[in-house]
């Protein structure tokens, strides 16, 4: 990296934060935890190495420059996701998955972090993975199950969506300001997709499904429910409907 900041002088996020530190030093150091401490049994599951390590760049940025800097960096690297093939590769034939295992993997973790909406617990999960799977070879299923169990949230459909398909889930929603109600559902997703969404302004958790639901929200929550706020924290698309479905 010629002893310079960024990756060969470039900021992979386009946010400016990636030029504050040496990409190679930060990224490769992250592999001491995910790859060297926890290693996958099959390279088809290499997202466990690269997705978590790529997310360490977001955590590093957040630690030194603040939470919004970390959000900026993570949102910025999203532009590098191609979604041409799934992150998980073919098993038993020495076949890695898509190169999206880096940035899409990192955005998946950022998404799950905000769905949990408990940073203390989220960091406990990261440490717990490295403690409980210390110097072991693992499968993605073990990692997925660990996160679901430790977070007390079943993220299986979330992992299936992001690791095993190239679809970006879309949150369809209609805001009825007069009635202080929100109608919402998941679209462009696998059957049974049920990833929770936390309204970060108040901490209220929604549990969308593929069928429309309606909920009462206060003025602060309705005001927060905008494309820019939602997509910044979650790797999803949003579609605000112009009429009540």
PLM regions: where:
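Amphipathic alpha-helical substructures
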Residues: 68, 98-182
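Hydrophobic/aromatic-lined pockets within catalytic cores
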Residues: 30, 34, 38-42, 57-61, ...
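Acidic/His/Gly-enriched intrinsically disordered linker/tail segments
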Residues: 19, 44-108, 133
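Juxtacatalytic substrate-recognition/specificity segment
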Residues: 1-32, 36-46, 56, 91-97
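Beta-strand-rich binding/interaction modules
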Residues: 122, 155-156, 175-231
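Edge beta-strands of extracellular beta-sandwich domains
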Residues: 232-245
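Short, surface-exposed helix-loop/turn micro-motifs enriched in polar/charged residues
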Residues: 21, 40, 44-48, 121-122, ...
